[in-house]
Structure formats: structure tokens, C-alpha cells
Amino acid sequence: MNIESQIIKATIYLRGNVEKMNNRGLYVGRFQPFHKGHLEAIREVLKKVEEIVIVIGSAQYSHNIHNPFTAGERIVMVRQALEAANVDYSKVWIVPVPDVHLHMLWVSALEGYTPHFNIVFSNEPLTRRLFMENKYKVKKITFFERKQYNSTSIREKMLTNERWEDLVPISVVEYITKIDGINRLRDLNRTDNV
């Protein structure tokens, strides 16, 4: 074996081992929109792992009442909120992942989109079950005022002109305002019935 082959082999070995050594957690959400409960969950996860992979789920959906924001817009919301909260961004990966509508393939599809992770943080029963069946360590996250910090209720408040701005980081308020997100959501909620 020549020296170049040995170097390549050693590099591949080291990369693989460094990748495996990272204590990296996975956190999946749609973030429609990103709110203070999400921010607290990420802070909690980062106390338990070296790095976090934040998966922007349902990445292919946007411009509908349940998923009004694009994957790109959600990435911006998450990133700006983390930066404003002084979260060490060198410990964060944000990855958009489209839905796979076949549960037995979802975990392997997600693995293909993300860097290696060795622990999953989720309270959602199906997510927990799918990862446990794939031999992942799965931990629950402490809910942070779940009834108040809930994306569905935040979208409903946006639609009904109720106060929602205190439920999301200020950077998210500013970004949703910039992209005219409230009017988008209201337009999506309209019907053409007479």
C-alpha cells in the first residue's frame, strides 16, 4: 500500500471516528412558526449534548393554513432566534427534511439528510416509537408552558388578530412582519365561496 492510500485510509477512519465521537442530539419540528417553547427546548437539549441537529420537518410544504412558511423562511426564523438568544451556533445544524409518507422509511430517510446523531429528543409519540424501533436512544423534553407556546394556537391568534407577538422571539415577529406572514396566513384562510 503506497503512502497516499494509507493517508486516505487514515483520513476516512479518523473522519468516521470523529463523527461517531460527537454527542449529537436530534430535535424535529415544523416550526410554523418558531416560538419560545422551541427555543427553550433547544436550550435544554444543548445542556445534554455537544451539538444539536434541528430538523425543519415537512420541508416541502408552505403556503397552506397548517404550514404557511417555507422551509427557507423557517430556517431564517430559527437561526435569527438562536443568534439573538446567544446560542453558540457552532453547535447547531439546521436541516430541512421533506416528509416521507411511509413510516417504516422515515428514520432512514431522515438519516440521509442529516449529520450523524446518537440521541433523539422528542415528546411526539410516533416520532419516539419510530426512533426507538430503529435502536436510537430517545429522551423526552420538558414542555415549556405547552398550552401557551403552541404553533397551532399562535397561528389561530394571528388569524383572529389576537396578541401573538409575546409568544415568539422578537426576531421571529420582525421576520414574519418583513415577509408579510400575517396577511399570507389570512389570505390562505379565505375561501372563494360566495
Predicted regions and their residues:
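Nucleotidyltransferase catalytic core that binds NTPs
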Residues: 2-194
